[in-house]
Design a protein with these regions (language model features):
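Signature for phosphate-centric chemistry
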Residues: 1-150, 154-257
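Extended hydrophobic/aromatic segments used for targeting, binding, or gating
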Residues: 120-200, 569-583, 594-597, 767-791, ...
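Catalytic or ion-translocation cores adjacent to nucleophile or general acid/base/metal-coordination motifs
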Residues: 172-192, 622, 626-633, 638, ...
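Beta-strand signatures of extracellular beta-sandwich domains
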Residues: 212, 937-939
Length: 986
């Protein structure tokens, strides 16, 4: 099979000149190293075996060492002999079915190795980039008037890879049994260029030139490129401006690069017990486990499609643990990833062979991690005892499963809810070929065990009619007779509204039965996500770890509304809500609503990261305002569509304040402030307070300016913890004050800024550490810095004393000055007092910037990045906490961190990558390496830059921040008083 390639430049009078220079064999035959490595792994299975073929040729088939290779090679010989003048016909040794089987296998191999197959994660497209750039260079020569006429010849594979990069919309290259229609013998691609010689003079600019593409003498259409209705030659067809094509292909290249990142992500990180240096330092029990999932999902989608090794929806038990040896099924999960909470509204399906087992513990079957393939868009595993391979891909509300059987027999698919209260419901619908049901959701923390007022509705839909089915003990099953090589396709979907929502979600997200198409659409969602932050480095392991962290930071908050915008009203009112946003044509649009905000964790880094890079962040913030309007109070820790009062603080207010100050779009700022103000100034009545509404211990806080030890804060999941609450309320008050200032609420601003100094009431002037205090003003005089105490949340006094993010200079003064402050910071690390496994410590490494010692931040942060984040299942120091731990890594690896999220300042750490792009903002780190971690100097847009912080305005702009890195600290850079972060209390 040959490729001919030509370029034509045609003027308005239709005279043409061939202008293409020879595509050298080097360009045509080029295979990138990653493509070569990938192609070695590609070995698509055949539907038929080789037993009949080998038995027909040999009396003793057991003597054949590699029967599959022999059969394949003889087929290749038979094909080659068509061109030889011999009467010998090797095809006679094959049956028609075997010839077709091998033909389809070869076509699939071609597609996997050179086409747009999801499995290759864009490696073929990336391999074609150099060829495309060579073509562009040739075109540029022609546009400048440097004309030559040549012919180019090559093989089919470079053309196929080039087509994969171009992505023509009218090719069905996923039809692997029709590959010869895409790239037949003598396949050719032509690019015909047009310009008007009466109006345009050479050299021509790209926007002055029109181009059309001809594949095998037929026009092809490029997706997402605007086509002219009529070409310069007066004919209808697909004509494009050359500059639009250039922009389109560069986006395709960027997407292919992002797709390559997906292939490197280890989705198992955090699914096993921690193996980091922080292990057993201060954590206990499940705190020393990442509690993550190797889930398939759409970024911030509703449902996480995950393998399951643990049944039920018990608190602190994740659906999957890497250390488990048996698989129970595949779950449509709403687990609060990375925490010690619980799943809700979930269901599980499990494929079985020959033996019907209903209970999760009975149907659990062995599996090997070597047989697992896990990516953000795809999960697959072989189950040897079930004689099948299970594959899964999914989107926000719906997923598709493909079960391929390795022998003849009876196949079962078992479906159950994961309701621990025995309230789940399942049924079979033979008209829709589905199993459906619902799983009632219950509250925890406040109102523990009460119904939340909504269900997790679901359906499992089969492509083929049910041959047999049944229900027993709350478990439903469907059965099919299968032969070796057969596939059973299943779709599943969820809704928190009703069954109509389930079926609409399926229709909207997966209206067909094309597994690879569904997977490709999920890949597209991830490419868009990963492209918002692009990094490049010679250290490929660091890049993989970075994008793995970004993956884990993309679970929560989750989409809560259906595709039609409907969702159950917050706090159990049982109303169904919907927020219209106009129409596109006749299609109505609805605002997506989000749920499950692990607020004590994510206001620190995850939500600030989202405000920088994630367009959906504004919708997340507006969802908090919705909760206020629907429930009457701004929630403290909104999960399970309920008030919870889990953890401490009032950080929904802090998060909304950051969004207001940083001018988030499509946010009702006045209504948001109304919600924040109510939490900051009002005390909930007894009934509302018991239900989880309002700040905990607010009466004491307003009366004393701190929460005394006398107030045990009983109406909360975390009782006591008075000092930590005071410190966090002081920050929340500061944050709300900034929102008040931005909105012109001057009286509120003055009151709240005074309250922002309340942290001083719990720093003992005698010890200069945080300490418990009684209502009469007397101190507890605690001297234990390293043991957990009741008045501190999930940590020690040494951890929490540093939590004054809005008044670091005030804390410095309270500790006795800059030197004592710096010495205590040193001690945090030299005496192993620092614990990265939980949130209260995570801003501490960046506090060196305030004392003019940024090189220590650089060293501490680099150590944490390297040691506390490992690309292995036990690679997280503690709970990932809805992605907060991973968001810390993302921001810190980029080179900055928001010590005070509501402020416009981000403290510079140590950049990890040669180059990073955050939207339009660029960070370059010259000479960065494992040794060169220290900043020697910096420039911003070419001008010297000595501040040890950057601003939100810089991050949202199009500037370039460049660092020169070295192996030794430069104690001059960023150390002067004027280079340190501003005092936020002035």
């Amino acid at each position: 099979m040959n490729l001919s390639f030509s370029l034509s430049l045609v003027d308005g009078n239709k005279s043409a000149s061939q202008i293409a220079r020879v595509l050298t064999e080097g360009w045509l035959a080029y295979k990138s190293p990653e493509l070569k490595a990938w192609q070695k792994t590609v070995n698509p299975p055949r539907r038929l075996g080789n037993e009949r073929f080998i038995s027909a040729l040999f009396k003793d088939p057991t003597k054949v060492e590699d029967a599959e290779k022999l059969m394949t090679e003889l087929h290749a010989v038979a094909s080659d002999m068509q061109d030889v003048g011999l009467k010998l016909d090797f095809y006679q040794f094959f049956t028609e079915e075997e010839l077709r089987d091998i033909y389809e296998q070869n076509n699939e191999r071609m597609w996997l190795c050179n086409g747009q197959a999801p499995d290759n994660y864009g490696v073929t497209q990336r391999s074609a980039v150099s060829l495309w750039h060579n073509i562009v260079a040739e075109v540029n020569c022609a546009l400048q008037g440097k004309l030559t006429a040549t012919l180019r010849f090559g093989h089919d594979t470079p053309l196929y890879r080039l087509l994969a990069l171009l992505g023509p919309g009218n090719l069905s290259d996923e039809q692997t049994d029709e590959m010869d229609k895409v790239i037949p013998m003598a396949a050719n691609l032509q690019m015909v260029f047009y310009y008007n010689p009466d109006k345009e003079e050479k050299p021509l600019k790209p926007q002055q030139v029109i181009v059309k593409f001809m594949l095998n003498e037929r026009e092809i259409r490029l997706l997402k490129v605007r086509s002219l209705d009529v070409g310069p030659d007066g004919k209808t067809g697909y004509y494009y401006r050359w500059d639009h094509v250039l922009s389109y292909v560069e986006k395709r290249i960027a997407n292919a690069v992002a797709q390559g990142y997906m292939a490197t992500i280890n989705t198992f990180v955090g699914t096993d017990y921690a193996v980091t240096p922080s292990l057993s330092r201060y954590g206990k029990g499940t705190e020393e486990h990442g509690q993550t999932l190797p889930a398939v999902l759409e970024p911030n989608g509703m449902t996480f499609w995950t393998p399951q090794t643990q049944d039920g929806e018990q608190k602190c038990v994740a659906p999957y643990y890497y250390c488990d040896e048996k698989l129970q099924g595949f779950r449509g999960s709403h687990w609060l990833v990375g925490g010690c909470t619980q799943d809700y509204g979930s269901f599980t399906l499990m494929p079985l062979m020959d033996s019907l087992r209903l209970k999760p513990v009975d149907r659990a079957t062995r599996f090997n991690h070597a047989d697992e393939i896990a990516h953000p868009d795809y999960y697959a595993v072989s189950l040897p005892d079930e004689h099948l391979k299970a594959e899964m891909t999914g989107m926000s509300h719906a997923a598709m499963f493909r079960f391929t059987y390795q022998k003849d027999g009876k196949a079962y698919v078992v479906v159950n809810t994961n309701n621990d209260h025995g309230e789940g419901f399942v049924a079979v619908d033979t008209v829709r070929n589905c199993i459906y049901g619902y799983n009632p959701v219950h509250r925890i923390y406040q109102g523990w065990g009460e119904k939340s007022g909504f269900n997790g509705w679901f359906a499992v839909v089969f492509q083929d009619p049910l041959q047999d089915y049944g229900i027993k003990d709350g478990v439903a099953w469907a059965a099919f007779d299968v032969s070796k090589g057969d596939e059973v396709l299943v779709k599943a979907a969820c809704s928190f509204v009703d069954m109509a929502g389930v079926y609409n979600n399926i229709q909207q997200e997966i209206p067909h039965w094309e597994f690879n198409d569904t997977r490709s659409r999920t890949i597209d969602r991830w490419k868009a996500k990963l492209n918002r932050v692009s990094v490049s480095s010679r250290d490929t392991a660091a890049v993989a770890k970075f994008y793995g962290a970004l993956y884990r930071a993309s679970f929560l908050p989750r989409a809560f509304s259906d595709k039609d915008g409907r969702y159950p009203s917050f706090a159990g009112s049982r109303k169904i809500m919907q927020h219209p946003m106009g129409k596109i044509g006749n299609t109505p649009l609805y605002r997506r609503v989000y749920m499950d905000f692990s607020m004590w964790d994510i206001y620190r880094a995850l939500l600030p990261l989202n405000l920088i890079v994630e367009p959906t962040a504004n919708g997340m913030m507006q969802s908090l305002v919705d909760m206020y309007e629907e429930g009457g109070w701004l929630p403290i820790f909104p999960c399970w569509n309920s008030y919870t009062s889990a953890m401490i603080g009032d950080h929904a207010s802090a998060a909304l304040a950051e969004a207001i100050v940083k001018d988030a779009r499509n946010l009702n700022k006045e209504k948001a402030y109304e919600a924040m103000r109510k939490n900051a100034f009002e005390i909930a009545d007894a009934e509302a307070y018991k239900d989880g509404k309002g700040r905990r211990a607010m009466q004491s806080y307003l009366k004393y300016g701190y929460i005394p030890l006398n107030d045990s804060v009983m109406e909360a999941f975390h009782t006591h913890e008075q000092v930590s609450r005071t410190l966090e309320y002081a920050y929340d008050d500061y944050a709300v004050a900034q929102a008040a200032k931005a909105l012109g609420k001057t009286d509120d601003y003055r009151v709240l800024m005074a309250r922002a100094r309340n942290w001083r009431h719990v720093i003992n002037p005698r010890t200069e550490w945080a300490d418990g205090r009684w209502a009469n003003g007397k101190w507890l005089n605690n001297k234990d810095l390293t043991t957990r105490v009741k008045f501190i949340t999930e940590g020690t006094v040494a951890h929490y004393t540093w939590y004054v993010p809005h008044d670091v200079y005030g804390l410095m003064q309270a500790m006795g000055g800059k030197k004592i402050f710096a010495d205590r910071l040193d001690r945090m690390f030299s005496d192993s007092l620092y614990w990265h496994g939980n949130e209260p410590c995570q801003q501490i490494p960046y506090l060196y910037a305030y004392v003019g010692q940024p090189w220590k931040t650089q060293q501490r942060v680099k150590t944490i990045l390297d040691n506390e984040y490992l690309d292995v299942p036990g690679g997280l120091s503690g709970n990932d906490d809805a992605g907060q731990m991973s968001a810390w890594y993302v921001l810190s690896a980029l080179g900055f961190y928001p010590v005070c999220p509501v402020s416009p300042y981000y403290i510079i750490g140590t950049p990890t990558f040669d180059e990073a792009h955050i939207g339009r903002f660029t960070i370059k780190a010259h000479h960065v390496s494992h040794e060169n971690i220290y900043i020697q100097s910096a420039t911003y847009n070419g001008q010297p830059y000595t501040h040890n912080y950057i601003t939100y305005e810089m991050l949202k702009g199009d500037g370039v921040l460049e660092f020169q890195m070295g192996p030794k600290p430069n104690t001059e850079w960023g150390s002067k008083t004027e280079d340190c972060p501003p005092d936020l209390m002035k």
